[in-house]
Curated annotation (Swiss-Prot):
Region (Involved in fusion and/or binding to host membrane): 120-126, 204-212
CC terms in the record's Gene Ontology section: host cell endosome membrane; host cell Golgi membrane; host cell plasma membrane; membrane; viral envelope; virion membrane
InterPro entries tied to this protein: Glycoprot_B_PH1, Glycoprot_B_PH2, Glycoprot_B_PH2_sf, Glycoprotein_B_ecto_C, Herpes_Glycoprot_B
Biological role: Envelope glycoprotein that forms spikes at the surface of virion envelope. Essential for the initial attachment to heparan sulfate moieties of the host cell surface proteoglycans. Involved in fusion of viral and cellular membranes leading to virus entry into the host cell. Following initial binding to its host receptors, membrane fusion is mediated by the fusion machinery composed at least of gB and the heterodimer gH/gL. May be involved in the fusion between the virion envelope and the outer nuclear membrane during virion egress.
Species this chain originates from: Elephantid herpesvirus 1 (isolate Asian elephant/Berlin/Kiba/1998) (EIHV-1)
Pfam family for this entry, one: Glycoprotein_B
Region of interest: Hydrophobic membrane proximal region: 677-725
TM annotation in the entry: 728-748
SUPFAM superfamilies assigned to the protein according to its UniProt record, in alphabetical order: Viral glycoprotein ectodomain-like
Signal peptide boundaries: 1-41
Gene: gB
Membrane topology (Intravirion): 749-845
Bilayer topology annotation: Single-pass type I membrane protein
UniProt-recorded name of the protein: Envelope glycoprotein B
Length: 845
């Protein structure tokens, strides 16, 4: 039910109105004067204005977290060292060294040429990209010298392809030297790139032509490489890997798996620090290595391996450490500051000066510094024991322990030693005296000295035994108490995880079990000034009868808002334990007669009698059940338990040989253009529909033939469609279709002409007039009548045959005349060359 429902509002108003007004006013005035708390009925609902105490936990929301931010667990089977009275405990300084995961970082220079071959095609309207090819070509040793000394590079590139040398020229021009320019610089990632070409060469072919363009870009990259112990290979920040030690010189025993013929070391090598035109500053290297790989070349400075980071680095140092040798012949190093115990086998002592000289020198310097700063006034070095103890812990850490002694104990031991020597000398001199005078000459001093020696020796032995026993007992009890406390916390956390984890972290958290681990979430603090608590715990009726007893809320109802919400926003919930706000209002119970409830809110306790607000008392007025057994001791310091982090986030970040962030930044910055890749042609077999496929399978061999035929037809159609989709194929198809249409039109017109006048079509020279020379041959007497009309009106087969032969000869002669006339005409080239001139008519003189 919502808190703004009318039924609930009427119930609240009824609760306010049914009280005696005078009694209610007296109660309010008394509470205001005595308890300094404001209780009022605002508008329609009764609420209590709560004053928060900053020293206690704030109002917050811990329940209902959908997802935890962290997961934790309690340790199991914690092993404590087995201390015994025979264990030898020694006080001293403890240094703990962890393995250094930060790799050896050194600068490198990468050389290569980027060859880009582009194919372009153009038609009338647009240009077409037919694909391109990009190759990385390593720079040879001779050209490297030109780059490092003069800051220039050749514009040509030579590479091997198919067993033959191939030459490529930038812009398809002659080979020449070009200067470098700054192409890209990333100071954070340590990448600086120099290029000779910032853009591709223009590639615009003519209409209906295909063009190939070449761009050769000389690229030099100054970046960093990383190598981790045992330094068998190193990785470059741009993603390349060199399978060889950075300390390999060609004649030492370092690992090198690259091609030896492509590797060379230069002594006293000088090169430019920057490859820009304005840079002239050079640097000389004692040794620099050059390696040519398949698609790039690389150079780096070769140093000695002792200049690399030490394999182990100091992690923790303690001036109050205890070394104890157990009955199992193992050493346990307990540190008060670290609240931890490290175990090591006593037979695995390290020889630091030989195996780890860098650790030995650093430990020596650290011991001297810590002793002079922290222990010089109270302790002295223990000269009776070894200089230092160095062992490898069970977790792979190097433990170096230096024994020290308290000055008071040393002074006591010196007094004992002095008294013992005095007693021995006096005894020696007395032996030379006579026996008669021995008893009389033994004075009180000798007896006093013997007594002092005995007393001092006894006191020292007793004190030493007591101190050693106390130290061992405290160390053992400390470990066992932590183990038991850990087990108790684990059991309590199963009952109430949030309360247990809040007590451990000393701040309110929300916790719940997720299987065998505990999810922990930070509580959300609400606006502290907006929290209001209602004065009644009775659930308003909704028109239905509850029975003999009404329903009442088991926890008070509250309203609140979050910090980022406006004052008009009202959220509802119920007040939980320790100022926790529980979401929802479903926590109810059957109302009890003569009930009284105390609820802590802030620095006050609100009392509800018969489920209505009665009065408020101060939280400090209620006595606390004292469960502590107080120890009357002074100068007792608390120990703060902290998580021991072996490696920091900075060390873990630096330990990665290949940095993905730097790689992606370099990739996205430099390779901004997307290269088109040639798509592989995959022939897909024809698959008929399911029903048709079943029918064809029933035809066995015949069905297979039909399926193959359909597949071939599909392949043919797909090939034709692919050809038409290509710009060249589509253009050629349009031209062929146009030629076919023009040819059909010409043929159609000629067929119509042949049908209309076949004689004129087949014999176009019939209508031509005879030449004059033909007429002159018939001048003379006309023929007779009989000769002119012929002897008959019909023609024989022989006449027809002669006529056809004559027509054939006539047609042949006409064609030869046309050919001769065509040959006599000038060609197109002659017409263009002799344009503006006219042909003179020939005359016979």
């Amino acid at each position: 039910m919502s808190f703004t429902d009318q039924t609930y509002t009427r119930s609240c108003m009824h609760t306010c109105i049914t009280r005696d007004h005078r009694l209610y006013g007296i109660v309010i005035i008394s509470l205001l004067l005595l308890l300094d708390n404001s209780v009022f009925c605002q508008n329609e609902n009764k609420v209590i204005d709560i004053k928060k105490d900053e020293k206690i936990w704030p109002y917050r929301i811990c329940s209902g977290m959908s997802q935890a931010t962290d997961i934790v667990r309690f340790g199991r089977n914690i092993q404590c060292p087995e201390y015994s009275p025979k264990d030898e405990g020694t006080e001293g300084i403890l240094l703990i060294y962890k393995q250094n995961i930060v790799p050896y970082i050194f600068p490198v220079r990468i050389y290569y040429k980027e060859l880009t071959i582009r194919y372009r095609y153009a038609d009338v309207f647009s240009y077409y990209d037919m694909g391109d090819v990009t190759k990385k070509i390593p720079i040879m040793e001779t050209e490297k010298t030109l780059i490092d000394m003069d800051g220039k590079c050749y514009s040509a590139a030579r590479y091997v392809e198919g067993g033959a040398y191939m030459d490529a020229y930038d812009g398809d021009e002659h080979n020449h030297t070009v200067p470098f320019m700054l192409g890209y610089q990333n100071p954070d990632g340590g990448v600086t790139r120099y290029v000779t070409v910032d853009t591709h060469r223009p590639c615009l072919p003519g209409t209906w032509l295909r063009k190939t363009c070449t761009t050769v870009n000389c690229i030099v990259t100054d970046t960093y490489a990383k190598s981790r112990y045992p330094y068998d290979f190193f990785a470059i920040s741009t993603g390349e890997i060199v399978d060889g030690s950075p300390f390999y010189t060609g004649d030492n025993d370092k690992k090198f798996s690259e091609t030896y013929t492509k590797f060379k070391v230069y002594n006293e090598y000088e090169r430019l620090e920057e490859l820009t035109v304005s840079s002239t500053k050079k640097r000389t290297f004692d040794k620099i290595a050059f390696l040519e790989k398949r698609d790039y070349s690389i150079s780096w400075e070769v140093k000695e391996e002792d200049q690399a980071p030490c394999q182990y680095v100091l992690w923790k140092a303690s001036t109050q450490a205890l070394m104890t040798k157990t009955v199992n012949n193992t050493y346990h190093f307990t540190s008060r500051e670290l609240t931890a115990t490290f175990g090591a086998n006593d037979k695995e002592e390290l020889k630091l000066a030989e195996k780890y000289p860098c650790v030995y020198e650093d430990a020596k310097e650290t011991f001297e510094k810590m002793f002079s700063q922290n222990l010089k006034d109270t302790h002295v070095l223990n000269n009776d024991a070894k200089n230092n103890y160095s062992y490898v812990s069970h977790g792979g850490l190097i433990l170096i322990f230096k024994p020290v002694k308290n000055k008071e104990i040393v002074q006591l031991m010196n007094i004992t030693h002095l008294l013992n020597n005095t007693h021995a000398n006096m005894t020696k001199h007395r032996r030379k005296r006579e026996t008669s005078s021995s008893a009389s000459s033994k004075g009180i001093y000798d007896l006093y000295g013997d007594l002092n020696v005995a007393q001092v020796q006894f006191a020292f032995n007793t004190l030493k035994s007591y101190i050693n026993q106390a130290l061992m007992s405290i160390a053992d009890a400390w470990c066992r108490d932590q183990k038991r406390t850990n087990e108790i916390w684990g059991i309590i956390s199963k009952i109430n995880p949030s309360a247990a984890l809040s007590a451990i972290f000393d701040k309110p958290v929300s916790a719940r079990y997720l299987g065998d681990v505990i999810s922990v979430s930070k509580c959300i603090n609400v606006n502290q000034d907006s929290v209001r608590i209602y004065q009644t715990l009775k659930v308003p009726k909704t028109g239905e009868e509850w029975g003999d007893r009404m329903q009442c809320y088991s926890r008070p109802l509250v309203t609140f808002r979050l910090d980022n919400e406006t004052a008009s926003t009202i959220r509802t919930g119920q007040l939980g334990v320790d100022n926790e706000i529980l979401l929802g209002n479903y926590r109810t119970e059957l109302c009890q007669e003569n009930s009284i409830r105390y609820f802590v809110a802030g620095a006050q306790i609100h009392v509800f009698q018969d489920y209505d607000f009665y009065h408020t008392i101060k939280l400090s007025d209620v006595d606390i059940v004292d469960t502590f057994v107080h120890l009357n001791i002074s100068f007792l310091q608390n120990i703060d338990f902290q998580m021991l982090r072996l490696y920091t986030q900075e060390e873990q970040y630096a330990s990665r040989l290949l940095d993905l962030e730097t790689l992606l930044r370099d990739f996205n910055t430099y390779r901004q253009r997307i290269y088109k890749l040639e798509q592989a042609i995959v022939t897909k077999p024809y698959v008929p529909p399911a029903g048709m496929q079943q029918a064809l399978q029933g035809l066995s061999g015949v069905g297979s033939v039909i399926t193959g035929t359909l597949g071939a037809m599909q392949s043919l159609v797909s090939g034709v469609a692919s050809f038409l989709q290509n710009p060249f194929g589509g253009t050629l198809s349009i031209i062929l279709i146009g030629c076919i249409i023009v040819g059909v039109i010409i043929i159609y017109n000629r067929m119509n002409q042949s049908r209309g006048s076949p004689i004129d079509y087949y014999f176009p020279y019939v209508n031509q007039t005879l030449p004059q020379r033909q007429l002159q041959q018939h001048v003379g007497d006309p023929p007779s009548y009989d000769e002119s009309i012929g002897s008959s009106h019909t023609y024989s087969k022989e006449d027809a045959l002669l006529m056809l032969k004559a027509m054939k000869e006539l047609d042949k002669s006409e064609k030869e005349a046309q050919i001769e006339a065509t040959k006599s005409q000038p060609s197109i080239i002659d017409r263009i060359r002799r344009r503006g001139y006219t042909t003179l008519s020939s005359m016979n003189i």
